[in-house]
Amino acid sequence: IVAIIYYISILRKAYSRLHEAMEKAEQANQLKSAFLANMSHEIRTPLNAIVGFSNMLPHVENREEMSEYADLIETNTDLLLQLINDILDLSKIEAGTFDFYPALIDVNQTLEEIEQSMQLRLRHNNVTCTFVERLPECTLYTDKNRLIQLLANFIVNAIKFTEVGTIRMGYRLLDPETIYFYVSDTGCGMSSEQCIHVFERFVKYNSFVQGTGLGLSICHTIVDRLGGKIGVESKENKGSTFWFTLPYRQN
């Protein structure tokens, strides 16, 4: 009898774990279904804008209006490329083919490249992006493209939620073995509850802002794979600071 009770207890625990796993799988499937439905809309919106303004452009004679249409095409092309890149990165993560190629890089030069790229992107916005904190010299053994992807994702996210103001980017050493990167903005900020879930997949706190809801989740994966930590500090209506740390290796 004792043996029967013991095995029944084991079966109940196994059933409970199975039921919990099935519920999580169902939630994941629902999220993926909602994601796919949302993506068809997210991709169609910039694509329609690109096609529409491209068709109108040959018939425009006013130079100022022509420049405006060209800027709109460029903006929507960047958005479409970001959407596609996020989806491709997710598929690589799921397939286990999300690769890294570390090498010794010049950190100041890399962040200056990001700053120049973002300033060009923001030339018609009421937002500035500035590289504000650095070491006189700094080399780091890491994947340059992934570092750029991390900071660019943070900055693009900040742009979405900052109508007017400043986005600041920088880095410093926390200790001899840890380097700390950050992107701060003066945007709308988030609640403490939102901060808890912001790095989860498919999370979007503003349905009017276009995107996959994958960018920050992908950042979390990159930082984890590089052996660092990631986080956010934010207050509603006060702005946000997204940050990550990496091992400070030079070989």
Segments predicted by a language model, with ranges:
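Conserved catalytic submotifs in the C-terminal HATPase_c
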Residues: 101-106, 123, 128-138, 174
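Primarily the dimerization/phosphotransfer
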Residues: 17-59, 78
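Alpha-helical segment immediately C-terminal to the catalytic phospho-histidine in histidine kinases
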Residues: 50, 55-81, 109
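Helix-loop junction within the histidine kinase core
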Residues: 91-102
